[in-house]
């Protein structure tokens, strides 16, 4: 696993890989942010792309917004999920459903409240290939839209970085590792080998 604070832009220097990447986006009542997320994913500088949105028990306009993208771009798939087993955490269950419908050799799990740079996927895949790693996770830039977020996000980030220093989480002699659930890029075979999201099905932090 690689979780790094180092920029993955050097992945852009790697040869382009002609590989299908499936992006899975879990969405529970995300009408405020899902359009921005999807539009940024569809603008990726990557030829072979599948975007799967799992609308998880939504009661707002999330499904309608995704449907608009489905109708104009055949790379987008909408999956409607109406229930969640008691033994599963909601997000993990939605991600498992998305993975079951994925066709790619690489799986990218991306949160609905994110906005991707056009080079994100190419840089991340290039860096994963360069390092020969089965899981690549990134630290993202955070946007604070509310005073409460502006107060709490820096404190939470500092706490995480003290527990999981980016320059140490990849060392083989450390039992403690860390990956950011906002973006996790898996090799499909390895993801299935370790049990996928079923292995952490009742964990709030997957």
Feature names for model-found ranges:
Residues 77-100, 123-198, 203:
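Long helical/loop segments within the catalytic core of UDP-sugar-dependent glycosyltransferases
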Residues 61, 110-127:
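Acidic donor-binding/catalytic loop of UDP-sugar-dependent glycosyltransferases
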Residues 30-33, 58, 117:
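Donor nucleotide-sugar binding loop of glycosyltransferases
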Residues 1-17, 153-154, 162-166:
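N-terminal membrane-anchoring/stem segments of glycan-assembly enzymes
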Residues 4-10, 30-43:
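Short, well-formed alpha-helical segments that are part of the catalytic scaffolds
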Residues 38-85:
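Acidic donor-binding segment of Leloir-type glycosyltransferases
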Residues 103-106:
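Short acidic donor-binding loop at the edge of a beta-strand
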Residues 19-22, 50:
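Cell-envelope/extracellular polymer assembly enzymes that use nucleotide-activated donors
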């Amino acid at each position: 696993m690689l979780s790094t604070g180092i920029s993955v832009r050097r992945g852009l220097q790697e040869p382009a890989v002609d590989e299908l990447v499936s992006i899975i986006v879990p969405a529970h009542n995300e009408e405020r942010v899902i359009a921005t997320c999807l539009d940024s994913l569809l603008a990726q500088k990557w030829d072979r792309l599948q975007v799967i949105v799992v609308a998880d028990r939504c009661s707002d306009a999330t499904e309608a917004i995704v449907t608009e993208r489905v109708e104009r771009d055949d790379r987008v798939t909408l999956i409607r999920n109406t229930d969640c087993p008691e033994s599963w955490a909601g997000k993990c269950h939605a991600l498992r459903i998305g993975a079951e419908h994925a066709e790619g050799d690489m799986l990218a799990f991306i949160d609905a409240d994110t906005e991707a740079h056009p080079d994100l996927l190419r840089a991340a895949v290039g860096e994963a290939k360069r390092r020969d790693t089965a899981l690549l996770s990134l630290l993202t830039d955070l946007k604070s839209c509310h005073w409460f977020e502006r107060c709490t996000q820096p404190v939470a980030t500092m706490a995480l970085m003290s527990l999981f220093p980016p320059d140490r989480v990849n060392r083989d002699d450390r039992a403690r590792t860390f990956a950011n659930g906002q973006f996790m890029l898996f090799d499909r075979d390895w993801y299935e080998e370790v049990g996928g999201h079923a292995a952490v099905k009742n964990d709030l932090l997957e």
